[in-house]
Amino acid sequence: MLAASTRTRQINITCDNPVDREVFLHYSLIPSLCIILVLSFLQRREHRRQRDDTSYLLGNHFGIIVPLDFVGTFSNRWSYGAAFGATANKVMFLFSEGYQPLTVPQWAQAFVLFIGGMEVGLSYFPFFACLSSEFQLVSSILGFSYSLTWFVVTVLQISQCPHGQFLGRFETLVFYWPSLLCLGFLLGRFLHMFLKALPVHLGLEPQTEEKSMLEAHQAKHVKQLLSKPRPQEGEKSWFQTRVYEWDPCFQFPSRMVGTLLLAFICLYLFIVIEFCVFLHVRDKLDMFEDKLESYLTHMNETGTLTPIILQVKELISVTKGVWVVTILPAALTCVTYLFHILACYRKHMKRLWAGDKHFLPQKFHSPSSAASVVAIARYSGWQIAYILWGYLIIHVVQSLCGVMLMYGLVLPIIHHRGLEMLQGFGLGVLTLSIVVGLIILQVWIAGTFFLQPKLGTSDKQKPLALNNRRAFHNFNYFLFFYNVLLGLGACLSRLLISCLLGTWLIARIDRTIMQSGYEGADMGFGAWIGMLFVDHYHTNPVLVSFCHILITSHKDRKLQKTVKYWCLNQSAGPRFSARARTRWFLLQTLINNPRLVMLRKSKSGHSSGEFTQILLTCSDC
């Protein structure tokens, strides 16, 4: 009772904070819009329509600002991840439907949540816009000022009200330290951008060259495809074989890194909130136990209900202990899923680059283009929601399994009924072993007596040809009635395994938990497939390299035309035939990849059989 009253006194403690992040979020829209207008004014419009009188004064200013290229951005990945992480607290408020700027009827809650999401996105838009802007000097100053403002507001909120109602001391710090860390990282990033852009603006350093559309890892991937496969040097370690192997020819886009970091922070906040709810429920249960004891003390003088009281108290105690213990395995399961999703993303992308779609269900081989474009916007948010809901469901299932384990194994030993428990456990294991043994025996009898012998000594199994047909028909007849009973258990085991796998893999958006033929009902898996195809079509290294060659060659030709007396300059050096150079490159490619000769079209009158045979012979050597 004393502990309960102490906790009650701690819950009743209130704090008047003059700085509220929720209220500041509304006022932050004003500087956010100002920063957006400044960056939009600096952004030039590349394609302008014919100007009229109303837009004459604007010129080619006020271009569209891109906060983040969700498809092809591979630089500043951790900076974008920190910007996503700074929004974690607001994302959790949106997830719990606790952030509603307006009070409307129940049927209009969806519109209110949409407006709230737009307000949160607009408030944090300057972080992303300043990171992606080409005008680094101005954007670094604006981004640093805006990040510093949010940093100061967060520090003031933590310092004014550090303690809370549920966790007690430093509760506010427990909730807001991830956002504070991300804001500090952004401050350092914007300061670094300012120190790099200032010498360029003052003319002390040359201006950086225009960024190429071909990333370094994409060029390495194409070079690896065009080169001969090298023999593997040494054996792979256990970590490389079982966990992860780093690939220098592959990089995760900024969207995936930001989603991963935001999912980690949201999962942490979700666990903290869940623990706060658990503390509140535990206090209520303690008060319920005290009231139950006092009530039964006055009403139950004979003591007939005492065993029921003890069982209820034992159930409450076991449930509370199991719930706390299973927090760690449930959290580790979801953390493992996050890393595994990255590994699956790389594996699936490489298969799509190689033209392999066999790992996808048949109906997802050609997804809708519109649905794929929407999927690239849905994926990040859905991935976080799947992880949070998956953690809660996994935690509940693990808690139920823990309670069953306690009542099945631990509590009988505590109550000195271990021998009875072992007897029941032994009978259950024996029954299950007999059933499984009969199933295996049926397979052995069928393979030994009812199949014809192997056709060759190298065959792995007997052919599917019946032998001893009369005995086989009697075998089927007498086992028919037993298999009816066996099918009941098989049906229940199918249901149990499906439930366990479904709940265990609910957070895995990279694979469907639906049956074959019903994968289209899994919207999360559809978003994953659509996102993969968008990335495949827009970041394929071979396609990007081809476009890069076209763009650079086009620029070179335009530059050659602008140079005066370019004919004289070109005649000064040796002249090469473009056709001969192309044939030389073709020969080099065929020598490195002799199997490609079989895929070439043969022209009439040009027999290349000897050359093909030579290349194929070289490939076999």
From Swiss-Prot:
Residues bearing carbohydrate: N12
Induction, as annotated: Induced in adipose tissue after high fat diet. Down-regulated by holo-RBP4, retinol and retinoic acid.
Transmembrane segments: 22-42, 54-74, 111-131, 138-158, 174-194, 259-279, 322-342, 384-404, 425-445, 477-497
Gene Ontology biological process terms, A to Z: establishment of localization in cell; retinol transport; vitamin A import into cell
Entry GO MF terms: retinol transmembrane transporter activity; signaling receptor activity
Keywords: Cell membrane, Glycoprotein, Membrane, Phosphoprotein, Receptor, Transmembrane, Transmembrane helix, Transport
Ranges per topology, Extracellular: 1-21, 75-110, 159-173, 280-321, 405-424, 498-621
Cellular component GO terms, alphabetical: plasma membrane
Residue numbers carrying Phosphothreonine: T612
Topology feature Cytoplasmic, residues: 43-53, 132-137, 195-258, 343-383, 446-476
Tissue: Highly expressed in liver and small intestine. Also expressed in spleen, kidney, colon, stomach, placenta, adipose tissue and isolated adipocytes.
InterPro entries assigned to the protein according to its UniProt record, in alphabetical order: STRA6-like
Membrane-related topology note: Multi-pass membrane protein
The protein's role, per its UniProt record: Acts as a high-affinity cell-surface receptor for retinol-binding protein RBP4 and mediates RBP4-dependent retinol uptake in the liver.
UniProt protein name: Stimulated by retinoic acid gene 6 protein-like
Gene that encodes it: Stra6l
